[in-house]
Amino acid sequence: MARKTPIVRYRNIGICAHVDAGKTTTTERVLFYTGLSHKIGEVHDGAATMDWMEQEQERGITITSAATTCFWSGMQQQFPQHRINIIDTPGHVDFTIEVERSLRVLDGAVVVLCGSSGVQPQTETVWRQANKYEVPRLVFVNKMDRAGANFRSVVQQLRDRLGANAVPLHMTIGAEDGFEGVIDLIKMKSIHWNEADMGMTFEYGEVPEDLLEECEEMREYAVEAAAEANDDLMEKYLETGELSEDEIKAGLRARTLANEIVPVLGGSAFKNKGVQAVLDAVVEYLPAPTEVKAIEGTLIDGETVDTRVADDDAPFAALAFKIATDPFVGTLTFFRVYSGRLESGTAVYNSVKQKRERVGRMVQMHSNNREEIKEVLAGDIAAAIGLKDVTTGDTLCAESNKIVLERMEFPEPVISVAVEPRTVPDQEKMAVALAKLAQEDPSFRVATDEETGQTIISGMGELHLDIIVDRMRREFGVDANIGKPQVAYRERITRTCEVEGKFVRQSGGRGQYGHVWIRFEPADDNNAEGLVFENEVVGGAVPKEYIPAVEKGISEQMRNGVLAGYPLLGLKATIYDGSFHDVDSNEMAFKIAASIATKNLAAEGGAVLLEPVMKVEVVTPEENMGDVVGDLNRRRGLIQGMEECISGKVVRAEVPLAEMFGYATDLRSATQGRATFTMEFQQYSEAPKNVADEIMARNGR
């Protein structure tokens, strides 16, 4: 099947931002202007098209990333038709994982900021993630009609707080209630959108006198930024002092794609102003799949690095970036095609699980309406129905050309609660529901506490787990009781040690004999996970066939901890000696011997308890500043800094998660509900001795 849209006219973008900056409203407007939704859905009516889960409509926040395809030909129909695949991502810190995996498969991003709040903590997180994946981006300063909105101040914050080379392409006309429209700095014309037809039409006008001088300065800055793209442009600019409109756009595009500048636009999505210009900017300044670095992967030998370029005739390679359970069709696997083509009904190879799978049907999503398609090509984002064993981050490829694309890294959960079904019939349904939800969301884990037999669920924050429990009730009909939230502590050793583990049972008949010497070393990083295991046994002191059992014994004991029953982080273990018995040695004996050696780490390795520390940011009125800082200090917080912002003072601190339960209520009562806070996981740090002793006593150690 031939392509309807050439790949150079594809744009795969994400719309991401801090919670409440107006991402979903912006996306709704995009769908309206591109002709996909005939009635604009409002977030505060609970009718937004992109927020299709019931919880999202109730809470007015976006939880999952809905993927949508739309088409755009420009505000003045000045472009050939471009195909824009949009992923609307959540801004709440507990769902950072959704943002991370969306950015992983996108070519460009639109970061939405609030005109009055400016750069907020989640904006910094999104920015860091976009830097990590080298995603070119542009910024839309939204909500310019809100009290306290200030375009210039937000541009300055982008430079100061994010270190971004922000290049404004708009200047806003008026602000707050007096917000009228924007000035296009490249054309040096004002744009007023028509309110009668919800901004579908607009008029160009002259730049208001009082803004002329400032706009000329800002335009000069943009032209200089464009001229730095290459020698030809710079030469022309130095000779004539001017560049044509097309040259300015070409220069800005080249530098945006190279992540050297960030174009900034302004408007108000709610008031239907500015979103159309953002769509034009997406076409003009963000990359097509062919303009980004070809994705790298490793061949099946696990070492050779290869690339996949965006070409329909190259071998097929795609990345599954999200699994969703749909009430009507079952499991939907969202995937991004990097190279090649795939027809529905054909087989693909999952190179991570090393399994063949058949793709039943494929659909293109418009929020949660779906259109069935027969074929996907390089650059497409689609969802497949009928893939059984695919999980987030798996690579789908042609069996004749196997490759594993870069895996995604998912954060460790920081908070756990026990869940119990209310009735016996709920028991089985709960197991099925939790398994499906864990398959969808890699930052959510399910485990069984071996001592109590309780089911423990873990996630990235209280809201995250609330929503999981809510979804169990709504989507799977499971009622559950929830325990008190528990902090996910960890353990680690602080020094290198050599430990003996010996397990001997020889009292007539077949005995047990396992004996090992293991050198344990701590990882350099407090937050390193897992076990690095090496075998340095020479001369057959421990036969090769027992070595895997030794590794298994260590890793099982690591899961149960050595101090207070919490998993042991970042450990390097090297078996270098031991002994065996011709008759009595077996795998089980060596596994137990290794487990005994690991248990001895509490004393030998100077094991310590680690607690999750959160990065907390509180925005408070000035008069409550003292109370807020005092309260954070009481919670063992380390104040990192304070600064002014439009709505008062911002206090930044690092606080142990254990001290943050119930903080929202305490902060509300201390400031009469005027302060707000956000927190996200920062790192694991050693817990003070008195805290560690208390936890060990509580766990009966």
From Swiss-Prot:
Domain tr-type G: 8-290
Protein name per its UniProtKB record: Elongation factor G 1
Gene name of the record: fusA1
Membrane-spanning residues: none
Gene Ontology cellular component list: cytoplasm
Function: Catalyzes the GTP-dependent ribosomal translocation step during translation elongation. During this step, the ribosome changes from the pre-translocational (PRE) to the post-translocational (POST) state as the newly formed A-site-bound peptidyl-tRNA and P-site-bound deacylated tRNA move to the P and E sites, respectively. Catalyzes the coordinated movement of the two tRNA molecules, the mRNA and conformational changes in the ribosome.
SMART domains (alphabetical): EFG_C, EFG_IV
Pfam families: EFG_C, EFG_III, EFG_IV, GTP_EFTU, GTP_EFTU_D2
CDD domains registered for this protein in UniProt: EF-G, EFG_III, EFG_mtEFG1_IV, EFG_mtEFG_C, EFG_mtEFG_II
Broad class of the protein's primary localization: cytoplasm
Organism the protein comes from: Saccharophagus degradans (strain 2-40 / ATCC 43961 / DSM 17024)
Binding site for GTP: 17-24, 88-92, 142-145
Top-rank lineage group of the source organism: Bacteria
